[in-house]
């Protein structure tokens, strides 16, 4: 008696040679993204911007279509995001900042995230958060490098979420316009 053969299906990106470029869906329309970054702890947060741009370009958005805006701190991010969303110039907005534990961390982080969600829902411009609130950040301590790495990883993650959401919304808007949904 022989057992039935099974075939393993793998993701082509996992089996592609390291030099092969990955292929992503193309956007039907040009996309423009605003990246609003806190300048507080810029040396830690900057990796988020750098990895975001690298990844978003790989996903099909031209680097010249990604604009960087710096604000003093994370608390100032939502107002800038709202003003940028109201211009209708951007198809997506990313927020990046570091909220340091000073007794108000929970209040500031919750306020910022809720405000970003409110902007997104009111304007229908997707807003992505790379605002981090570590419990143990001290400038100059050995864990500073850990947080730099975290922001670099977060930048790539938010680029993927941004591109995937823009593609999803583009399809959804097309279906709505066609009366399918």
Swiss-Prot record:
One of its GO terms (molecular function) is 6,7-dimethyl-8-ribityllumazine synthase activity. One of its GO terms (biological process) is riboflavin biosynthetic process. Pfam families: DMRL_synthase. Disulfide bonds: none annotated. Its EC number is 2.5.1.78. Pathway: Cofactor biosynthesis; riboflavin biosynthesis; riboflavin from 2-hydroxy-3-oxobutyl phosphate and 5-amino-6-(D-ribitylamino)uracil: step 1/2. Keywords: Riboflavin biosynthesis, Transferase. Residues 1-23 are annotated as: Disordered. Belongs to the DMRL synthase family. NCBIfam families: PRK12419.1. HAMAP family: Lumazine_synth. This is 6,7-dimethyl-8-ribityllumazine synthase 2. The gene is ribH2.
């Amino acid at each position: 008696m022989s057992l039935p053969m099974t075939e393993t299906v793998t993701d082509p990106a996992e089996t592609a040679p390291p030099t092969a470029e990955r292929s992503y869906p193309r956007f039907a329309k040009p996309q423009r993204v605003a990246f609003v970054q806190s300048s507080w702890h810029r040396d830690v947060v900057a990796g988020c911007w750098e990895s975001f741009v690298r990844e978003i370009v790989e996903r099909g958005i031209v680097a010249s279509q990604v604009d960087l805006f710096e604000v003093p701190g994370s608390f100032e991010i939502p107002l800038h995001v709202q003003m940028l969303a109201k211009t209708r110039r951007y198809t997506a907005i990313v927020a990046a900042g570091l909220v340091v534990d000073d007794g108000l961390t929970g209040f500031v982080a919750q306020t910022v995230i809720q405000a970003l969600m409110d902007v997104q829902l009111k304007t229908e411009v997707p807003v992505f958060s790379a605002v981090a609130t570590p419990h143990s950040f001290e400038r100059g301590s050995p864990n500073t490098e850990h947080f730099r790495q975290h922001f670099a990883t977060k930048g790539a993650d938010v680029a993927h979420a941004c591109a995937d959401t823009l593609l999803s919304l583009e399809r959804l808007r097309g279906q709505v316009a066609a009366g399918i949904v």
